[in-house]
Amino acid sequence: MSSPDARDARSPSPRPRSPSPAAPSRSWSRSRHESPSRSPAPMRERREEEGNEQRSPRQIAHHPRSPRGSDRRAEPRRRDAGGGGGDKYRPAKARKQRSPPPAATEEQKQAAAKAEYERLLTARSGGTYVPPARLRALQAQITDKTSMAYQRMAWDALKKSINGLINKVNVSNIKPLVPELFNENLVRGRGLFCQSAIKAQAASLPFTPIYAALVAVVNTKLPQVGELLLRRLVLRFRKAFRRNDKAVCLSATTFVAHLVNQQVAHEMVAGQMLLLLLNKPTDDSVEIAVGLTREVGQFLEEMNAAIANVVFDRFRDILHEADIAKRTQYMIEVLFQTRKDRFKDNPAIRDELDLVEEDDQIKHFVELDGELDAQDGLNIFKFDPEYEENEEKYKKLKAEILGEGSDYEDDSDDEGSDSSDDEPAAAEQKAMDIQDRSNADLVALRRTIYLTLMSSMDPEEAVHKLMKINLPQGLEGELPSLVVESCAQERTYSKFYGAIGERLAKINRLWTDLFEKSFEHYYTSIHRYETNRLRNIARFFGHMFSSDAIGWHCLSVIHLNEEETTSASRIFIKILFQEISEAMGMPKLHTRTKDAALQPYMEGLFPRDTARNIRFSINYFTSIGMGVLTEDSREFLQNMPKPALPAPPPDSDSESSSSYSSYTGSSYSRSRSPSPRRRSYSRSRSRSVTPRRTNSNGRNNARSPSRSVSRSISRSRSPAPIRGRSYSRSVSRSRSRSYSRSVSRSPTPPRRQAPAQQRGRQRSYTPSDRSRSRSYSRSRSPRGRSYTRSPDRAGPQASTAPRSGGPPRKAGSVDNRSPLSRSPSGSRSPSPRRRRDSPSRSPVRDRESGGRAAAAAPGNSEARRGRSYSRSPSRTRSPSPAPSRRRRRDSSSDASAPRKRRRESSR
């Protein structure tokens, strides 16, 4: 039975009765067959619904319900309006309201979040898709680090991060990506790292060198990671080799080869793989071995040539004996050609991937057939009871690897954290910049310039290509230097390089200055080059000077003198000026050297400082056929003032004046100042009366050697400044020209000749004046000569050789004229001891020079050629040295005097 409330709720409010006659019967039938508790409203609604089903939707849309019916359903009429739901029979009961659910605690929320997270991760389908916002919300609710859910969440984040970093590594970003990789816990995730690296390498073999370089960097700090990766690769190779899986074998061997190149794996690992592959050769195994050898061959040749030789010998045997396909044979032949080319297309390590110093690398050796543990359990998540302690340990290790101030924020999605991370990353990148001191950039630049020069057909093309080369700042001087060096290495000079230098210098002032500096550099270091290179360099710069590509003021670095030049520099100057004269012509070159604006820069080539340097320059240019350039120097040398006379020495008691000679020294009579070449002191007196005709056997006993300083006193009564000449065939060693002045007091007869009846003939001329005077001679003796037709009869002592024992020299009778001798004849001294009929009135030799002629000893030694002029015969009383040997002298014998310095005075 339904309650009255239910009936009221289902039945609408009563309607007024219909006036139609059928209404009572319809009402009676309902009341007759139905329970009185049911309301007729449901029947009407059912009929209306059946009618609506028969009608179309459009008809339903345009068939509005009766507003009276809707009003009845919306607001049913109740008897008790204040009761809230009753009918006219019973009042409505009070409604029960539900109590709110109790608030969940924090523990309950954590538990619910963990349960939901576990349900999502452990679902049978592998985990349903969870929107990122909901996943982050779930993760944010899990904050307990000791819980498995939190560690599982951190493990998933670590896996995604390592996998993402390995997948995006390339040559350009490998350096900044290394710190990001170390920011992840690679000790906990070393299995994930190895797994991701192997998968990424197998998917893209051309990127194997990049992955190997990344592993090499990690291996320097975490060697256990590199060792684990090597063990897994070896196990992967062994499994694939047994299964005949060529693709896996190829990827594993390629990765191992590049790890060997990076010195992560020992070269014996690659050697074992090669020997295993070539033990029973098949087409696939030989192909894999060829690929492995191509990658690791250069490293084996350099580090362990024995392994390389064994492997290539095995390849040679396979090529000749094994039954393999033509394609495989061709691969082996190509491999041998690659080895012949020194693996130039397969370098061991590319320059941009050489990130680790050789000393920092750690090698791992793994036996190919040994017991290896892949540690596959590191690939899956495991709960760590000491999670926080292990994380703190890795943070300390990370600080040691990256530095104290290089920690990275975990939240990479936050823009603020990203901007704050940029500064430490930039600092770390700056700290990791490697200073390349191997000059690799310089070598590459010089190679580029050289190849550009060699590949050009003409100078215009070469200059056009050279101008396109991007020269780093500070290395602009390499271009002129390499042009000169390329020119120098040619067998003969090529105008190709001269034209290049000329065009470069005329394009920009920068190149002009650089070529001028190059000229100075090469001139100062020209002695380091061989003759052929020196010639090419000189001709190159000769072309530059002749074409006015560089300024002539550069010639100021040349100082043409004996002290500052070498044989190489003199050859360089010669070839330089010959090239300039051939290009310009001698008249233009002469005009250029006489240019007034260039004279300050030509002082080194044509010096004006000393006579010696001027003569050196004149002789140099004359010897190379360019004497016309030295006309001004010759004129300057002729008009060059002579230097002042040197002051007499303070210990000289000479009464006569001394004169200057530019080539030889001076001798002073009555002085103790020595002459420049040979020095001795002697004093001789001569007293002779010269008759009008005398036959005398003159004896000259002189002990003074050549260049002696003599003191002689002659007395005559009449001064007779008349020139006289004495000729003697015995030439003394003292080459002196003596000038003497004397006043004679004795009468001097006129000159007279008589045949000499002595062994030595003398001929002298004395004036006819009679004078008596005491004279002091002043002698200047550069190269005096005395000529006699026979030597003096100086007794047995004079006919002996001097003490010096010098070898005799051939005499030459040269007629050399000397200045006047103004010593008067007719002295008071007696005549010589031996007299013969002599055609001369004065058998005297060079009395004024201290008995130099008297010191002439027989022999063939060359004596100093001198002329003496005297007007009276004299006999010197200075004793001659003791004879060392006697020798018969003829009419053309020469006298030699000892070179030893002796001072001896005898009166």
From Swiss-Prot:
Q: Does the keyword Cytoplasm apply?
A: yes
Q: Where is the composition biased (Pro residues)?
A: 13-22
Residues covered by the MIF4G domain: 159-342
Superkingdom field: Eukaryota
Compartment(s) of residence: Cytoplasm; Nucleus
GO MF annotation list: RNA binding
- Acidic residues bias located where? 406-425
List, as start-end ranges, the regions of compositional bias called Low complexity: 655-674, 687-731, 753-772, 817-830, 869-879
Q: Where is the composition biased (Basic and acidic residues)?
A: 1-10, 43-56, 68-81, 837-850
Q: What are the alphabetically sorted keywords of the record?
A: Cytoplasm, mRNA processing, mRNA splicing, Nucleus, Spliceosome
- Using the record's annotation, list all stretches that form the MI domain: 444-560
Cross-referenced Pfam families: MA3, MIF4G
UniProt cross-references to PROSITE patterns, sorted A to Z: MI (PS51366)
Where are the stretches annotated Disordered?
1-114, 405-433, 639-907
Q: Which InterPro entries match?
A: ARM-type_fold, CWC22_splicing_factor, Initiation_fac_eIF4g_MI, MIF4G-like_typ-3
Q: How does it assemble?
A: Associated with the spliceosome.
The family annotation for this protein states: Belongs to the CWC22 family.
**Reported function:** Involved in pre-mRNA splicing.
**Cited PANTHER family:** CELL CYCLE CONTROL PROTEIN CWF22-RELATED (PTHR18034), PRE-MRNA-SPLICING FACTOR CWC22 HOMOLOG (PTHR18034:SF3)
Name listed for the protein in its UniProt record: Pre-mRNA-splicing factor CWC22
List the lineage, top down.
Answer: Eukaryota, Fungi, Dikarya, Ascomycota, Pezizomycotina
